[in-house]
Amino acid sequence: MSNQDFYATLGVARTATDDEIKKAYRKLAMKYHPDRNPDNKEAEEKFKEVQKAYETLSDKEKRAMYDQYGHAAFEGGGQGGFGGFGGFGGAQGFDFGDIFSQMFGGGSGRAQPDYQGEDVQVGIEITLEEAAKGVKKRINIPTYEACDVCNGSGAKPGTSPETCPTCKGSGTVHIQQAIFRMQQTCPTCHGAGKHIKEPCVKCRGAGRNKAVKTVEVNIPAGIDDGQRIRLSGEGGPGMHGAPAGDLYVTVRIRAHKIFQRDGLDLHCELPISFATAALGGELEVPTLDGKVKLTVPKETQTGRRMRVKGKGVKSLRSSATGDLYCHIVVETPVNLTDRQKELLEEFERISTGLENQTPRKKSFLDKLRDLFD
């Protein structure tokens, strides 16, 4: 038995609860299981270490002994007084298959390496218009499919998997550790109860090969940037007939040239001429549904916010719809003709002294006078 600390092996504190230990074990067992890491000796060793740690820490009496005596509790020359624990053999032995049955829906205590497929996470980029109105997208995801040479059996065509010679088909073996007799997953067949003597040359005994699957994603109207869509059963395929995992699609919304989104509302800048700002007028403004008319009142200043009701984004969870807010920017004309310059100069002359026509300028001058008086 390895002398590595069992708690460190599972990555839990010494005060960890039974549920925390079980959760940590499940995660590591799935990560390092030989079926998921074929021909990976390092993963196989890690899997064995995780097994040993869980076999001890999942049993209250064994855990108590380990907490008190460490690894010496399971060695022949350990502390005295352990004879009373001889009952760990036989029916009270550790059944490694139980935990896998709970994890993956197996039946009896026999170890069942039927792993639910992994969840798959992918991202997709859509336009603001698509996010506002909803859209269907087709995406390609990496997956596995049954081997077309062996039809998923993993065995060379013309042959069949044989009963495992090590466990005789039970999927488990018994090992003796000092005074303890424990049951664990068969190291030869990894709990399947069968052994492939002549593996398929294409899938090398796995029964499946890498593939690409096309999935249609229904993106609902009103979805926001960063939200996820879950497609049940569209993730990685299960092993040996277990259910597939789920597919999680994270939505990213491409930056728009005109609009910025804030929840259900949209915002945009609306440039207007200084003549329209002074006299008022009617303008066409863009929305996600096309152009609409907007009346600009006279004497409008830069920074004024005008609302176009109901031209925002539809709510994902209710019948509400946001609004469009146009932020006015009064533009100073450039590249003036001589005639335009003459008219502006004339306008400036006849406006001199009419401070009530420029309230912000008057307020600024009043503040200057107060500052220096």
UniProtKB/Swiss-Prot annotation:
| InterPro entries on file | DnaJ, DnaJ_C, DnaJ_domain, DnaJ_domain_CS, HSP40/DnaJ_pept-bd, HSP_DnaJ_Cys-rich_dom, HSP_DnaJ_Cys-rich_dom_sf, J_dom_sf
Where in or outside the cell is it found?
Cytoplasm
Record keyword Zinc present: yes
The keyword NADP belongs to this UniProt entry's keyword annotation: no
Molecular function GO labels: ATP binding; heat shock protein binding; unfolded protein binding; zinc ion binding
Annotated membrane-spanning segments are: none
Record note on cofactor: Binds 2 Zn(2+) ions per monomer.
Task: List, alphabetically, the Pfam families matched.
Answer: DnaJ, DnaJ_C, DnaJ_CXXCXGXG
List GO BP terms, alphabetically. Answer: chaperone cofactor-dependent protein refolding; DNA replication; protein refolding; response to heat
For activity, the cofactor(s) needed are: Zn(2+)
SMART domains for the chain: DnaJ
| Family the entry assigns | Belongs to the DnaJ family.
Q: How is this protein organized at the quaternary level?
A: Homodimer.
HAMAP family per record = DnaJ
Q: What is this protein called?
A: Chaperone protein DnaJ
Say which species the protein is native to: Neisseria meningitidis serogroup B (strain ATCC BAA-335 / MC58)
Q: What is the lineage of its organism?
A: Bacteria, Pseudomonadati, Pseudomonadota, Betaproteobacteria, Neisseriales
